Amino acid sequence: MFWDEVNMKCLSVSQPYADLIVKGKKTIELRTWNTKFRGEFLVHAPLKIKKNVCIKMDVDETKLRTGVIVGKAEIYDVKVYNSVAELKSDYKKHFASEEFLHHKYGFLLKNPKELRIPIPYKGSLGFFNVDLKTSVKANEIKTELFDEEYRYQWIGKH
């Protein structure tokens, strides 16, 4: 389980897309490259914000967190897109603008989780490793995730 992990994969995703992923609104992350990786990963929001996307989607960019790990999600499969029409048909799952319709691979996501306390971290290209043991506030973050996930298991079950 997540709270037992100390070293996790992480992927930088520009804002507002990072927030959309951890809130469960964006379920496909488009990339130009494929991956064999399946499982939980951390979602990192780099410093750059896609302002044109914020305007288009009516997102207040001043409320977006950057330079931090904002949550986690799970990749359970990769969809290969063979045409722009296919990409456009999944728009409500990836929200990519026209400039990204050349991206051929869609990482299919599930089980998103937003952190209430983001972890300050410098991003990198592609998947990179994050050692939670040495991260700032790691114990608090792991405890928070454990508490939230434990509580979630019991909602509506008493």
Pin down the residues of each PLM region:
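Structured alpha/beta reader/binder surfaces that contact nucleic acids or chromatin modification marks
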Residues: F2-H158
